[in-house]
């Protein structure tokens, strides 16, 4: 948890306690009151864009290991941000997607990281709440909001950090999920993570 400038640990004792917390911050899109704290949500992506690397400490050093362990924890458990009476929670896969999984931006025709958008933030919380309630979720969305990239990011998060995971993807057309479609995103993510992270 980032609380007014300091990182602390927040624990939930039960699934119900965790679910209640997520419900307490779930709102309608446009009502999340993002402030300057939201610049921290994708801080690691911006550092990578600036430096060409995530961590400038020498590989294998204590600071290097601390950095990558801290980021791994956020990618496995999510990150809570608090400031001026507001609280935001980035689920594990959303945090990883914003910071460590670049997407191809069709508007500018190059790879980069996703921007923080309240509609995607809302979708991440909505899908997490469905999972916590053992429910399925459906989403009606507009095109070109990187939804396929995000959902492949959810998969790569599980593949990267959980042992023995089995995942399934379905689509109305085979080309949506084969190497012409979303599978391509998994390959892009794998290549980037192998090249630029310590995981």
Question: Could you describe each region identified by the protein language model?
Answer:
Residues 1-199:
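Phosphate/NTP-binding elements of NTP-utilizing enzymes
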């Amino acid at each position: 948890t980032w609380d007014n400038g300091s990182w602390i640990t927040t624990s939930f004792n039960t699934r119900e306690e965790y679910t209640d917390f997520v419900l307490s911050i779930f709102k309608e899109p446009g009502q999340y009151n993002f402030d300057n704290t939201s610049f921290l949500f994708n801080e690691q992506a911006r550092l990578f864009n600036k430096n060409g690397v995530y961590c400038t400490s020498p590989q294998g050093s204590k600071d290097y290991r601390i950095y990558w362990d801290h980021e791994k924890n956020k990618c496995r458990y999510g990150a809570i941000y608090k400031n001026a009476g507001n609280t935001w929670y980035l689920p594990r896969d959303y945090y990883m997607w914003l910071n460590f999984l670049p997407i191809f931006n069709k508007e500018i025709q190059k790879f980069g990281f996703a921007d923080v958008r309240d509609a995607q933030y809302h979708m991440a919380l909505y899908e997490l709440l469905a999972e916590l309630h053992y429910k399925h979720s459906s989403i009606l969305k507009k095109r070109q909001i990187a939804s396929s990239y995000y959902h492949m990011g959810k998969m790569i998060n599980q593949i990267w950090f959980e042992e023995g995971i089995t995942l399934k993807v379905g689509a109305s057309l085979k080309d949506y999920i084969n190497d012409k479609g979303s599978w391509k995103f998994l390959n892009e993510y794998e290549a980037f993570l192998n090249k630029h992270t310590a995981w």
